[in-house]
Amino acid sequence: MNIIKTGIKQSLVSGIYSKVGIRAFCTHYSAELEWVKLSDDNKVATVGLSSFGAQRLGKINYVELPKEHRKCRREEKFGVLESSNATAFGLYAPVSGEVLEVNEKLKKSPSLLNEDPANNWMVKFKVSKPDEFKKLMDSNKYKKFVQWYR
């Protein structure tokens, strides 16, 4: 029964990948310790702090995020985290775009990034250059990067 379900699921997913592109379904990572998820239509990038980044920084005490509608170029600083292990840790745009939304909950509860970094995003960008997403690391490259970083 599981084999059949798995086979159906895999072929269904393979069909979706070929229509939309694999980028829409994978989490990618920046060298600035951020995770990035691209929407199904490749127009919105959701950005958060990676688990490794949260671990490395220690307890996050303060989050400064950009205002909505701000335009950022790839690798441009858009915010700051302050933590027990880093006085100020810069946040950099993994792709070029306009800030659509910021996670306001983080301003009141910055420790959410420590508690569940995978599900507590920081910023959503309207992507202006989708090809820049290819410059980010997939999970395998990120694992190697993290090993080197340690």
Swiss-Prot record:
InterPro entries: Biotin_lipoyl (IPR000089), GCV_H (IPR002930), GCV_H/Fam206 (IPR033753), Single_hybrid_motif (IPR011053). One of its GO terms (cellular component) is glycine cleavage complex. Transmembrane segments: none annotated. One of its GO terms (biological process) is glycine decarboxylation via glycine cleavage system. Pfam families: GCV_H. Residues 44-126 form the Lipoyl-binding domain. PROSITE patterns: BIOTINYL_LIPOYL. Belongs to the GcvH family. This is Glycine cleavage system H-like protein gcvH2. The gene is gcvH2.
